[in-house]
Amino acid sequence: MACALRLLLGVAILAGMTMTSQGQPAPPAPPPVPDGPRYVVTYVDVMQTAKDEGAALVRQFRDASRKDAGSLRVEAARRFGLPNQFVILEVWKDQPSFDAHAQAAHTTQFHDRLKAIQNAPYDERVHFPLSVGPLPASLGGPAIIGVTHVDVIPPQRENGTALVKQLADDSRKDDGNLRFEAVTQTNRQNHFTVIEVWKNRKTADAHSMNAKTRAFRDKLAPASGALYDQRFYKALD
């Protein structure tokens, strides 16, 4: 009798688990990737002993890429406190122009030369615009560049998209902001990159502490799929 009761209890628990899993609707499929500009964010990490060589390679790649057909903006920056880490920020007219650039001889040469000194694999992420302003001139001087990778779990994609878009729309109005862009990864639409440029460190810090930014982080936290990874850089000369 006891064995029969245990068996019935096990069947009931299994049935309940099955009903629960079946009762949860799958997250909606992401929409098709739109045509138009491609925003490319690439993280480069070289050995500490090769930081100067890495900077030279990144500069050469930046300068050569600016001459490629379809290039709308190509910038490079070095991370504060970690001079062996860089970010490359590119904007291309469309996917075909980016694809052609990716096959260019100078791009292949850059990748080959970088492999000998890299600390981590070349991390390139292709995006389409979510909330961006006009394309300003390239950076320089005391400007502070913030680059943040935002990852939300797939069921929260639509909510995450709305939150990140609102942050960009609001932040472009803040004092000292020179650029605030939110872009969506083409191959994972629950992943975003936020690119922000501030007049100086004081205005960047003020934005990070204001009520709107803190409220955004509070709302995003339950949907997050990974650490909110914010990094600050200074443009390479």
Roles of regions detected by a PLM:
Residues 1-9:
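Bacterial N-terminal signal peptides that target proteins for export
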Residues 24-36, 75-84, 109-145, 179-188, ...:
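Glycine-rich beta-strand-turn "strand-cap" elements at beta-sheet edges
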Residues 20-22:
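Sec/Tat signal peptide C-region and signal peptidase I cleavage site
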Residues 61-65, 69, 102, 114, ...:
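Sec/Tat-exported extracytoplasmic proteins
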Residues 50-73, 106-110, 154-178, 212-216:
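Short amphipathic alpha-helical segments
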Residues 37-45, 75-102, 142-151, 181-208:
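Short, well-ordered beta-strand segments in beta-rich or mixed alpha/beta enzyme
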